[in-house]
């Protein structure tokens, strides 16, 4: 199987062979050793299965790919409102440390920055959509200078395509190959 092949590629001694065998809806609490871990379903946002793990006694939350700190997030699934709500939920938790899926550990300031980015691109994309601008043009037109220190600005192509899909009320995303092509073209233009 693909699973067994991947074990061989990375070294099976480094992999846990037990697959997940419990599902939940919305939220659940688990005991891991002496730790209480609260799991919250916050997707679909980045992907369909977004979950955050909150360890209240340690005042830490593990966000998975809900947070890309110092990098442009990528909105594969959406809707963006779920992602913004996930940020609000994280901010409402009693946490000192936020462990993102990508980049350095942060605090609530990092979460607010991602929330502000998502709100900004939503509003900017909506204005352009309402004015009849095509998604590909909007990607190039939206001013990202406030986020110029963040990596991977080409992800705006996927984000705007996802937002336009959301505005049209469609579920099916663009072909992934097309989205990667658009990101590549944005990289080439910045060259």
What are these regions (language model features)?
Residues 1-16:
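Single conserved hydrophobic/aromatic residue that forms the stacking wall/gate
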Residues 5, 20, 26, 68-71, ...:
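Glycine-rich, flexible loop/turn motifs
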Residues 7, 22, 60:
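Residues that recognize and position ribonucleotide moieties
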Residues 7-8, 92, 140:
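Solvent-exposed polar/charged
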Residues 12-13, 17-32, 48, 123:
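Active-site HxH/HxHxD metal-binding segment of metal-dependent hydrolases
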Residues 29, 36, 41-127:
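Metallo-beta-lactamase
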Residues 133-191:
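C-terminal regulatory/interaction regions
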């Amino acid at each position: 199987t693909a699973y067994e092949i991947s074990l061989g590629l990375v070294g099976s001694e480094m992999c846990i062979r037990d697959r997940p065998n419990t599902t939940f809806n919305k939220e659940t609490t688990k005991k891991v050793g002496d730790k209480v871990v609260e799991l919250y379903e916050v997707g679909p946002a980045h992907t369909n299965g977004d979950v955050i793990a909150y360890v209240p006694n340690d005042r830490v939350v593990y966000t998975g790919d809900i947070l890309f700190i110092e990098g442009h997030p990528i909105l594969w699934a959406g809707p963006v409102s779920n992602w913004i709500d996930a940020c609000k939920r994280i901010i409402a938790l009693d946490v000192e440390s936020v462990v993102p899926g990508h980049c350095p550990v942060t605090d609530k300031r990092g979460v607010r920055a991602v929330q502000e980015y998502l709100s900004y691109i939503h509003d900017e994309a909506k204005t352009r959509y309402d004015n009849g601008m095509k998604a590909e043009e909007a990607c190039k037109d939206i001013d990202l200078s406030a986020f110029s220190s963040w990596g991977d600005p080409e992800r705006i192509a996927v984000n705007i395509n996802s937002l336009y899909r959301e505005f049209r009320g469609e579920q099916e995303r663009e072909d992934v190959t097309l989205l990667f092509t658009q990101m590549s073209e944005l990289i080439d233009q910045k060259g």
